[in-house]
Amino acid sequence: MPSDANEMQARLLQLFEHSTLSTKAKFGLRVIRDPKLAGIGILGRGKIFSCFHEDHLEEASRLAEVLVGAETFDEFIDLCHQCRDFVNEALFVYSLSVAILHRPDCHGISLPPIQEIFPDKFVPVETIYKAFKEATRHADKTDDIIVDMEATGTIMDPEYNLAYYREDIGINAHHWHWHVVYPSAWDSVKMHMRKDRKGELFFYMHQQMCARYDCERLSNGLARMIPFHNFHEPLEGYNPHLSSTQNGLPYAFRPEPMTLCDMHDVSVQDLERWRERILDAINLGEVTDPNGDEYALDETFGIDVLGAIIESSRDSKNRESYGSLHNWGHVLMANIVDPDGKYQTNPGVMDDTATSLRDPIFYRWHRFIDDMFQEFKRKLKPYTKDQLSFTGVEIKNVKVHAHEENVITTTFVEDLLEISNAFNFGRTGAVKVRYQHLDHEPFVYDIEVENHSARLRHGTCRIFLAPVHDELQNQLTPEELRRLMIELDRFRVELKPGVNHNHRHSRDSSVTISKQPKFDELLKGKGTNNANEYCSCGWPDHLLVPKGNDRGMPFHLCVMITDYLYDLVGDYGYDTPCVDAVSYCGAKDSLYPDRRAMGFPFDRPIPEGHASNLHQPNVSFSQIKIQHH
């Protein structure tokens, strides 16, 4: 990292500050724009930018390519200054973020939290309005102001019981950041960088979101979600209570019951046709490109090929035939209220990666998408005992050390979000929103493993969690459990001959990240190192485990140790920088550091009679409880 890392960080942060306000006074006005910016600025300022929308994404990708292609850091900054005030506000932030993450001279630079750049995507409009009222009322302009987050619903709606999860700032920021790290329009040729197993990561990260959501539903006494399956059925209602500061209009409220309608760019029939073509390809075991060449959907690369097609990304083998099912589905649902733009309303939250997780239909839609991936997985043979075993390694005992052994406690805690970096309140004091989020007590896994061989061995420890019972308190079958297994951690262990005690703290999870540096902390130099830029993509640590219930909800804890020498990809090691959230986000500029399928061993179906294959010496199933206070 160059010695002036803090200065570079500060120059970039200026571009994000007050992103919806003009910066001509700050950066100056260029009369003549750089020719590289020709054709950029089509999406007007004030419009809602969506990286699910084909045209929006195309423009954002062109801008990102220009910014990444700048030869020097100064040229990069100059291009940013030129386009900052004529490019759509959210599109600019998205493209700038993609560029920062992928420019070699920006390695070590941290992105500011998206929730501080666009708090209007995370904070109810009633709360923001209250903050402005308080800022006006306080005579002392140097005082900090704190307002409480307003509720977005009532208990009359059963889904409101899950608002704490769907509207959690951390997971919505994670979703936005994941799609910045893995843009669907990423062009490997132009960017000179291939995103390893990007299609499979798209499948796995969203599959885990669905599994986690169902675990939360069961924690709250609700039934598991019903997957979306019929393009003509009415959708449940949802009111996000968000309003865009880019144009002052609210994100569209979806009343009940409404059904999907055709838009100018895409029709409901298009989505149905793409679904059937993708399912046909899965059943045939191959996809066809525009030239008629066939690509087998095999057990090694098939899921990656399928992920690129379903999303769809630039890596899709045939976008003309298989379309863009996932992306256009988001757009159609977001525009259900005003599909032809007759009333000039904003789309709903499904249009935006920073807001879509708030809507219950997001999870039903992604369970539908995941069901298509599972159709492919059902074509693969179940794992054999040989594929699941690690000869000579035996897990003797697993404990979870917390305040009470094998009981993890969750609770709601308070946190603050500063919003004065986005809005001009006319004061020097900070303006913050106080809100609550779910959190868990710290805990430590104690895994006793015996290495029966006479030599040192290395293993990959994989830890998963799934509820014991369904919504009717029936025990879940192995196949049902498989779809609900959430990954808690994956790490390397060293196994000396004899008995080994391996301890792993929950904060070190390969799934999660701890808190990102805040905007003001970044200005002071915190976070400028090589271990940050991809790491901020991970799942929030405070939602590592589900909520549980007040009685202590029982969960299966599965611990599996596999052969690290087989799992290892190339010369990659877990000591490489920036792998704290490798499970969902991969590793920076590297191959995905695990040869196994993502979600292994629960990625493939477990037919009746095959569950015993998992009962190996190197696999442990135990029960723990998660208790909510």
Swiss-Prot record:
Gene3D superfamilies for this protein: Di-copper center containing domain from catechol oxidase, Hemocyanin, C-terminal domain, Hemocyanin, N-terminal domain
GO-annotated cellular components: extracellular region
Any one Gene Ontology molecular-function term assigned to this protein's record: chloride ion binding
Tissues and organs where the protein is expressed, per its UniProt entry: Hemolymph.
Glycosylation sites recorded in the entry for this protein: 451, 618
Binding positions for Cu cation 1 per the UniProt entry: 175, 179, 206
Annotated localization: Secreted, Extracellular space
Chief localisation class: secreted
InterPro entries assigned: Di-copper_centre_dom_sf, Hemocyanin/hexamerin, Hemocyanin/hexamerin_mid_dom, Hemocyanin_C, Hemocyanin_C_sf, Hemocyanin_N, Hemocyanin_N_sf, Ig_E-set
Entry keyword annotation includes Nucleotide-binding: no
Chain positions recorded as Cu cation 2 binding sites: 326, 330, 366
Function: Hemocyanins are copper-containing oxygen carriers occurring freely dissolved in the hemolymph of many mollusks and arthropods.
Subunit note: Tarantula hemocyanin is a 24-chain polymer with seven different chains identified.
Misc note: The two copper ions bound each have 3 nitrogen ligands (presumably contributed by His residues) and share a bridging ligand (possibly contributed by a Tyr residue) in addition to binding oxygen.
Protein name: Hemocyanin C chain
Source organism of this protein record: Aphonopelma sp.
